[in-house]
C-alpha cells in the first residue's frame, strides 16, 4: 500500500465481483474513500468502504443515491463505470430486446452516471472518469459478440467525447479495454457456449485460453492495476484514450 488514492472519493459500480471488485479492493488498499455499488447488495460485502445497492439503469435511483453520497462525501474525485453485460451471438441472434438491454446497461448506464456525478467534479475543477470497455469486437473483431462489441465501441466513443468536452475544466476520461479475463462473467459465457455447442466446459474453456497470445487468461487484478493508474494523479497527462490490458490479443 502506497496511498496512491489517499483521501480521494472514488465510486465503483458493479463492485460485487470480477473486475469491479478487484478495482474496489485496489482503490481501498490505496487509501481511497471508497463507495462500492452493485445491483445485488450482498455481493460487495467484505469490501472496505461505503457499500450500497444501485441499479445503474434507473435514473431516479441514481439521483437519490447521488444526493445521499454528496451529503456524506461531497463531490467525487474518481468515477469507475464497470457495470456491463455480455450477449452471446451474431446479428441474427440479437432481438430488439437483446439490443435494448445491452445498450441500456453497457452504454446508457455510463451516460447516466457521468451526467449525474460530473457536475460535482466540475465544481472541484478536477476528476478522473474510468469506463470499462473491452478489447473484444470494439478493438478486434471476435465471433458472436455482435451487440456486445457495438456497445463497447460506443463506450470508447463516449469516453473520447467526455474527454474532449471537459479537458479545459480539469476532467480526465479514459477507457480500459480488457481482453479475456478470469471472472464470473467469463464463466457465464463458457457455460452459454457449452450449452449451445454441446461441448464440455473444459473444451470450451481451452478454446478461450488458446486464443490468448500469452497462453493464459488475464486476472481481474491486472485490470485493476491499470484502473488504479488512470484514477490516480500519476496519469494526470492522460485523457481520452482506450487503454488495452489484453495480453496481446489485439496485436
Predicted regions and their residues:
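Short C-terminal tail/terminal secondary-structure segment
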Residues: 2, 139, 216, 239-251
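Substrate-binding pocket helix/loop in short-chain dehydrogenase/reductase
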Residues: 90-91, 95-103, 208
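Active-site helix of classical SDR
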Residues: 114, 151, 159
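Alpha-helical segment proximal to the catalytic Tyr-Lys
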Residues: 119, 164-165, 236
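Residue(s) in the substrate-gating loop at a strand-loop-helix junction
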Residues: 134
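Short, small/polar-rich loop/turn modules that mediate ligand/substrate recognition or access, typified
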Residues: 167, 172, 238-240
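C-terminal helical subdomain
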Residues: 175, 199-234, 238, 247
